[in-house]
């Protein structure tokens, strides 16, 4: 059994501390603007540990921070303190579950808002000496 950390041992890589620091919409907005290099007018909603499960037999996800802005765009902000080999597929799955939750039956695909998945790591996940990796879903031709 892992020993529980004391409050003074917590860092931003711990879920509790991460949420306590990032639950402030102004602070969260500035962090997202800096990382994504975008302008966000106002954040509307910040919730911690949001669980999404789209079907009875589907894999559930727990979003560390689920954030929306005044345009309806969605930001999923995650903190990851252990090495994971399947990061690109995990991000793909998270984004797909978020997208499924956005549309109601019969809604047009144009109603899908922008969504971003941001992971904070305490290590370089791809070992390329970078502090930011950007992935886009796009056609190459």
Model-inferred region functions:
Residues 1-141:
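Elongated, amphipathic alpha-helical interaction scaffolds
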């Amino acid at each position: 059994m892992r020993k529980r950390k004391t409050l003074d041992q917590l860092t931003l890589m711990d879920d509790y501390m991460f949420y306590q620091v990032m639950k402030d919409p102004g602070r969260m907005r500035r962090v997202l603007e800096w990382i994504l290099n975008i302008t966000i007018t106002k954040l509307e909603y910040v919730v911690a540990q949001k669980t999404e499960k789209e079907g009875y037999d589907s894999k559930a996800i727990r979003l560390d921070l689920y954030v929306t802005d005044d345009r309806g765009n969605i930001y999923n902000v995650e903190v990851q303190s252990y090495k994971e080999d399947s990061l690109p597929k995990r991000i793909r799955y998270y984004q797909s579950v978020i997208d499924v939750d956005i549309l109601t039956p019969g809604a047009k695909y144009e109603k899908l808002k922008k969504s971003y998945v941001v992971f904070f790591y305490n290590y370089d996940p791809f070992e390329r000496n970078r502090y930011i990796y950007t992935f886009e879903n796009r056609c190459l031709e």
